[in-house]
Amino acid sequence: MHRLKDKRALITGGTSGIGLETARQFLGEGARVMITGQNPATAEAARKELGNDVQIVHSDASDPAAQKALAESVRQAFGGLDVLFANAGIADLRPVEGWDAAGFDRTFAINVKGPFFLIQALLPLLANPASIVLNASVNAHIGMANTSVYGASKAALLSLVRTLSGELIGRGIRVNAVSPGPISTPLYGKLGLSEADLKAVAASIQGQVPAGRFGNPSEIAKAVVFLASDESAFTVGSELLIDGGMSL
């Protein structure tokens, strides 16, 4: 199938996990794809996996100035944009008393401020019609311990889905979100835990999923393809919860 034939797409955080798998599926659906990342090693691995048809840009997801530079890269490469998947994010999990202002600000800078100012910078380039997909989380809905700041940042994204939908639909720009449950991605390996603690955390989380397992990046990417394509042309301001029943 070529549901995204000739669509120009930007995926932030596209060098690993959900972003990388989404880039793979976008390419398979006929899109022209640019991805961002910060780690040179994962960027090189992504290039080897995806081939030379994908463009990879080093970009800091937390910096508003970097979002303007990224928009300029999109303009130079594509001339405009049909699809944005704002996927870059971090999951910093701590108890309430473990937070300081710097950590709090970093989470919101990457998970909320970055996507907001990227959308702002891309507005002159977004086509009519265009699709924006934000990567939120089931943690915006459930009261899991140690996720207060992470969950709040993802809840902020869901608020943006609704408010930006109301503001941008007149320009033909649809805004929607995917909210994954626990997914087998490198994100969990970035929590700074020992191997034993990481396994314990994973087992605890898996026990809270009615489906009895972690999801796969491909299961999220398929939903993003749908929201990016014309198949979802009447889907505006919506959230797709893909969580194995965790939010029941």
What do the predicted segments below correspond to?
Residues 95-96, 100-108, 205:
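Substrate-binding pocket helix/loop in short-chain dehydrogenase/reductase
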Residues 137:
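Residue(s) in the substrate-gating loop at a strand-loop-helix junction
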Residues 119, 153, 161:
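Active-site helix of classical SDR
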Residues 124, 166-170, 233:
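Alpha-helical segment proximal to the catalytic Tyr-Lys
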Residues 125, 213-242, 247:
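C-terminal substrate-recognition "lid" of short-chain dehydrogenase/reductases
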Residues 8, 15-16, 39:
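Conserved glycine-rich cofactor-binding loop
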Residues 40, 58-69, 101, 219:
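The beta1-alpha1 cofactor-binding region of Rossmann-like NAD(H)/NADP(H)-dependent oxidoreductases
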